[in-house]
A protein has these predicted regions:
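Fe-S-dependent hydro-lyases/dehydratases of central metabolism
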Residues: 1-374
């Protein structure tokens, strides 16, 4: 596939068809019913017309068409009735204490969870670390761009759930903690460890950041100059310098599954605002719930029409007197050559409760404060 630059496809009956989800080298994935998956597997190709072409041949050379093997509704119902019994579920859930190996796991009785600093699966998340500072709005001036993305960026582009590349920031973290590549598992299985998940944010092998010169994968340039570095390494450098970050997107930013880590990882990278042409509804809400401001361009503007290349610094003005839903704001652009530009924005905080979420630095600190105050 690499040497011939092939665009290969997979067929699956799962509920996700994100790029590179089945395999990093696969660029096309199609969702379909289980019988169709079997049919395409028998055919061995994706460019087949099942109405006119046979999917296989019998041992004596006769053509076999999909219509010859497609089960009728009565056959499906009969098979389900024979193989699926209510007793199966009764037996499975009758003993909720778990198997013997589960019972042998040692645990100490305590009111709270005993965090294991050496665990690569579960770590104490930092989402409550800012509770004492909640109510203090972060500055939105001098922001550095971390990524300039296009249209239809999915939550899987932002926070992939598939395999963990050994040469990426998350893979290097696991290797440094004694985990061999064969034991990496997946991002989805390690979502209890923020150190892994933050390193995996914007690290999808198929994401394209305009700041990375056309390179595919989770790369960017610090200050928009020099060699490509990982998104995570760049964010760490900006944190050392005390500079906040901004991400630009196109239309339908955050589409796909409502993956919470797409917003959590964005927050933990140090991103303070995301500016896009439009947002998917749930991801917009999740960003606010993590204390990240979503803004939409107005008047047809976008990163391309503004000529953004990643060397700029940005400030967002118009929120100095407090936040309110659907507020107008101005994006001030300071270019590397000293010139200035601006664009009108719409704050996509849509309700008063979302104002509370943001000013509390997210929904988690807000809930904790309410519990403590009781």
């Amino acid at each position: 596939m690499k040497s011939n630059d092939l665009v290969c496809a997979s067929v699956l009956s799962g509920n996700r068809n994100f790029e590179a989800r089945v395999h990093a080298l696969l660029k096309a994935n199609y969702l379909m019913s289980p019988p169709l998956v079997v049919a395409f597997a028998l055919a061995g190709r994706i460019d087949i017309d099942f109405d006119r072409e046979p999917l296989a041949k019998t041992p004596d050379g006769k053509d076999v068409y999909l219509s010859d093997i497609w089960p009728s509704s009565s056959e499906v119902s009969e098979t389900v009735a024979k193989s699926l019994k209510s007793q199966m579920f009764i037996e499975r859930y009758s003993d909720m204490s778990g198997p013997e190996r589960w019972q042998k796991i040692e645990s100490k009785p305590s009111a709270t969870y005993s965090w294991d600093e050496n665990s690569t699966y579960i770590q104490k998340p930092p989402f409550f670390d800012s509770i004492e500072k909640s109510g203090e709005l972060p500055t939105l001036s001098g922001l550095r761009p971390l990524a300039i993305l296009g249209d239809s960026v999915t939550t899987d582009h932002i926070s992939p759930a598939g395999s963990i590349p050994a040469d990426g920031p998350a893979g290097k973290y696991l290797l440094a903690h004694g985990v061999q590549p064969k034991d990496f598992n997946s991002f989805g299985s390690r979502r209890g460890n923020d150190r892994v998940m933050t390193r995996g944010t914007f690290a999808n092998v198929r994401i394209r950041n305009a700041m990375a010169g056309g390179a595919e994968g989770g790369y960017t340039k610090i200050d928009g100059k020099g060699e490509n570095v990982s998104i995570f390494d760049a964010s760490e450098e900006y944190k050392k310098r005390g500079e906040g970050l901004i991400v630009f997107g196109g239309a339908d930013y955050g589409m796909g599954s409502s993956r919470d880590w797409a917003a959590k990882g964005t927050k933990l990278l140090g991103v303070r605002a995301v500016v896009a042409k439009s947002f998917e509804r749930i991801h917009r809400s999740n960003l606010i719930g993590m204390g990240v401001l979503p803004f939409e361009f107005t008047e047809g503007a976008d990163a391309a029409s503004l000529g953004l290349d990643g060397t700029e610094t940005f400030s967002i003005k118009g929120l100095e007197n407090g936040l309110k839903p659907a507020q107008k704001a101005i994006l001030e652009i300071s270019r590397a050559d000293g010139s200035k530009a601006s664009a009108n924005l719409l704050l996509r905080i849509d309700t008063p409760i979302e104002v509370d979420y943001y000013t509390s630095d997210g929904i988690l600190p807000l809930v904790l404060k309410k519990i403590v105050n009781k």
